[in-house]
């Protein structure tokens, strides 16, 4: 192997190790709770944290259970959004949680980083509003009368605190490296796009006050959207993600569209550096599990259909017995009683 090839291989290895480690904090999702463990046991022994995250943990121990919930939210939402895709957001019980897929600069990695940073911002914000954290509470900057004539009142979600904590905790590895590498720039951009997905979908919730349900006075507050809505928004951004490449702009490096004919991406868009594998066949070196054995939809022409999901390999069909509730009746008072029925269904799995 030539010296140039050796250097390139070494760079790729460092790139992969750095990229995987940047998302290792997601291993917190595998824990049942971090809130009941003392500081000494918690922060030093939590798997997947780099030293600066350990220090943040020590300074913000009460917030760490929200970070864990945010990681869980992110993984669950990723698996929901990709449940019918060739890559279905499978996780491992080791580091990195999503396997080697996140070590590559693909659009799948872009989604993982975006939904993860959004998960932390969301969970910390909700913890602030629910009174779980001493360091933050409701957003008191939202007050007075709105231009629409309603009174700002109640507990507005403190999204500013949630976003700031997510930036400090999730972005720390990339920022500690100076954010100069292509992958660091990609990760930071997608982290911010995830948080933007919450900010752009913040909503106003209101309550009417008056005699007999009239709305003489209406009080309103700002609330984060349901996390499912955030997941849908980021999935749309995934489908329209922009392939980029690093370029020096002035004295700094920036990511620009690889195809000059494409319009520049915005802060809310996802970006990626390299095309994705097809995820058809198992390749443990790149962390691809393949689609063999996956359940498919025989009648669908979409990606969940047997033709596309099974990558043209065909599929097996089996008759399976499904247990389900049936003949349900309401009994006074107050419960529903059902029978357990067996139903034969066809199950199709990829060859």
UniProtKB/Swiss-Prot annotation:
Q: Report the subcellular localization.
A: Secreted, Extracellular space, Extracellular matrix
Q: Which Gene3D superfamilies match?
A: 3.30.2460.20
Give a short account of its post-translational modification: Palmitoleoylation is required for efficient binding to frizzled receptors. Depalmitoleoylation leads to Wnt signaling pathway inhibition.
Q: Which GO terms describe its molecular function?
A: cytokine activity; frizzled binding; receptor ligand activity; transcription corepressor activity
Which residues lie in coiled coils? Answer: none
Gene Ontology BP, a term = kidney development
Tell me the superkingdom of the source.
Eukaryota
Q: Which residues form the signal peptide?
A: 1-22
* CDD domains to which the protein is assigned, alphabetical: Wnt_Wnt4
What is the protein's major site of localization? secreted
Look up what happens after changing residue 83 to C.
Answer: In MULLAPL; with androgen excess, normal kidney size and location; unable to suppress expression of steroidogenic enzymes in ovarian; impairs protein secretion
| One Pfam family it belongs to | wnt
Give all cystine bridges in this chain.
78-89, 128-136, 138-155, 206-220, 208-215, 280-311, 296-306, 310-350, 326-341, 328-338, 333-334
Q: Tell me what the record says results from residue 216 to G.
A: In MULLAPL; unable to suppress expression of steroidogenic enzymes in ovarian and adrenal cell lines
Does this UniProt record's set of keywords contain Kinase?
no
> Could you tell me which residues are lipidated, with the kind given as O-palmitoleoyl serine?
212
Q: Answer whether the UniProt record assigns the keyword Isomerase to this protein.
A: no
The annotated subunit structure for this chain is: Interacts with PORCN. Interacts with PKD1.
The Swiss-Prot or TrEMBL record describes its family as follows:
Belongs to the Wnt family.
Name of this protein: Protein Wnt-4
Query: Origin organism of this chain?
Result: Homo sapiens
